[in-house]
A protein has these predicted regions:
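Alpha-helical transmembrane segments and their juxtamembrane interface "caps"
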Residues: 1-233
């Protein structure tokens, strides 16, 4: 099912590229890249709005339980001070937790540099919980900003295209280049959609079973460069 959905998205992007031509397809892909870059830069501002809403932020801290990831190794470790955990023990705890990407790496880095010390966060369980919530907020912020920007930019591009009665088309190999660019655009869009996978897995861990059964889904999740650009705090 996941593979089919991905193939449909890629096919639609290839067809759109073929129909619109190489120049339009290239500009359209560039617009998506630009929207992603702006969304990435605006994460701190957007996430800050959510974090300054005590009711919403505390609600998320309550809902996204990070303690259970620690208890997968030992319940007693939940209340262990983060600075008292060795690198080896921390690696074991994170491996046993089987956390969504990039939660595991984010937790390890935040604990090693005591990122939340100024907030009074001390225990291992609280570090897991806080990191998960912050990463989720950052992902949702980036995705939401991207969607809004992409819709506005796409609508603007359509108006420009209509005003000039379409962008020029290459005399030779236009179909080949336009389809290729359309495919790359589709890959980029799928990567963007898969930003939501860690959030979904945090809420419903059993979804990982369906993801592991998907060849394309597993690829776009495990080999997703966008996930590693998400801020850790």
């Amino acid at each position: 099912m996941i593979d089919l959905a991905i193939l449909i998205i890629l096919s639609l992007c290839v067809l759109a590229g073929y129909y619109r031509g190489t120049i339009y397809a290239a500009i359209n892909t560039g617009v998506t890249v630009l929207a992603l870059l702006i969304a990435l830069l605006m994460i701190p501002a957007a996430a800050g709005v959510i974090k300054h809403s005590d009711r919403l932020y505390k609600g998320m801290l309550y809902y996204f339980e990070g303690y259970e990831y620690v208890s997968a190794t030992s319940v007693e470790q939940v209340h262990t001070p983060a600075n008292a955990v060795s690198d080896g023990d921390l690696k074991t705890i994170v491996n046993n937790a089987n956390m969504p990407i990039p939660m595991g790496d984010a937790v390890q880095k935040n604990i090693r540099r005591l990122a939340y010390q100024e907030k009074g966060i001390v225990t291992l369980g609280d570090y897991f919980n806080q990191t998960i919530v912050d990463v989720v907020i950052n992902i949702l912020s980036m995705f939401g900003i991207f969607v809004v920007l992409r819709l506005i930019m796409g609508w603007t591009l359509r108006i420009i295209d209509s005003s000039f009665e379409g962008f020029p088309v290459m005399n030779r190999y236009d179909a080949v280049f336009s389809c290729g660019i359309g495919f790359l655009h589709g890959v980029l869009l799928v990567y963007t959609l898969f930003l939501l996978v860690p959030v979904a897995l945090t809420v419903v861990p059993r979804l990982e079973t369906f993801l592991n059964e998907s060849l394309l889904g597993g690829f776009f999740y495990h080999v997703n460069p966008l996930l590693h650009l998400i801020p850790m705090t």
